Amino acid sequence: MKKQYMNYMKSCLLVVIACFVSMVGAAQGFSPAAMEQLKTKRLWSHSQNAAGMPFDDIQNYSNVILGYDLQDGNYCRPQEGQKEAIVGVSSEGFINLKNAYVWGAFNFAQKNLTDAGYNASIADPFRGMPYYVADQHLSKWRNQYYDLKFRAATPLLGNHWALGLEGNYVATLAAKQRDPRVDTRFYTLGLTPGITYKLNNSHKFGASFKYSSIKEDSRMSNVNSYVDQDYYILYGLGTAIKGIGSGVTSNYIGDRFGGALQYNFSMPSFNLLLEGSYDVKAETVQQSYTTPKKIAGVKDKTAHVSLTMIQEGKNYTNYMRTTYTNRNIDGIQYISQRDNSESQSGWVELYNNIRSTYKAQTASLNYALSRNRGNEYSWKAELNVNYTKQDDEYLMPNSVQNAENLSLGLGGKKNFVLGNSLNRRLLIDVHVAYNNNLGGEYVYGGSHADYPTVTELQQGLTNYYTCDYYRIGGSVTYSQQVRENRRMNLFAKVVFDRVNTSDYDYDGRTHLSISLGCNF
């Protein structure tokens, strides 16, 4: 209880800091299109180095958004809810204190899932941890997400150097509502110090180092103690050990280390930022707190490269961003022996080796052309290309799962002026996308091929990742100033998206979002 109380107090403190940053930055105001343009041009804010803030646009801004999201349809992964409803609030702000630059953000979301399956132990089964517990029963989940971030940086020291620090705290509380139930708490706390060097007005260099700690406490139980439940302890790609009862207690502990390098070339009408990063996460899972037994772990290595360019002319702005990510996860299993001697009571690790590998490559290209109008745009045309390749393997007995996809998206936005008084705007967005599956399969070579972890969980994931589908949607945003002499802009936004596919008896998925907010 004391530890949970301390975590709660830390959360409250960070909320106060984020809100303070937002309120102090309330001197400026932007329409939704102007806020979008401002964030797009702040290239260093999308990097992993807080020390780059002096090289971005340093005018103050803040926003607060209240939102409701609803997703419905069976085109989803087996662990996702066929229906998901989210209520959330977010706040973000940047302030120029002359002798320091400070940015803060806070996000809270309450997510209610309906008919989610094959997860009975962890808050996020897609975070790169293949070792968790699953069951067949579709269930409701009640999840809460807290995400707090801050960045602080010095102005240029000696006209060349700048120092910066980024911190973030993420907490997730998730509860499954049907036996076997789970109450799981996920936490991560990270710090990223950085430094930048300005060679001259055109060339800047940066370096940053990242560390974060990871913790998840998962406790399963049955409310109906008279009925034992079946569950499956997953080891990857359908391999599982079946259990019966009230489940297990799992303790996930991990650390992440990494670093990034940045190069920035800028001219009055052109800005380019190149960044390369590499990080390694090591995480293990233990069962039981009284006599901990190390079950498995992962070594997660991620390399990422991004190139962002923006060219601003008198009438038009060109924006391009391309990224490449290569992620490799080694799944490690442990063999332990119980030792009840007086000197060494508990489980003793005898051996460990890599039993599975998970490889993922993603590449993306985003291009946008916008027509300038003051600090916002009149219209914008967008092109998005995304490529993903997944190649997973359980080594012995051998099982494989792979998928390869290429998607193309087109979009257009028009920012209508409804009146110069009160800065009234109507922003309309229309977008379409098509995903072409280039191949994929799932071949299971282990024992118990009739387990639902094989026939329903992994096969369901393969079906999801090997679908051709198209997406069509759009949004409408109305905004205006509160008063003529105040630059606070209120806005209301409605988003609708529909994904359709005829593969594997899917009937698609619908997304509806409604939000209210204000920009300062």
Regions from the language model: what does each represent?
Residues 239-383:
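Long, internal scaffold/assembly segments composed of regular secondary structure
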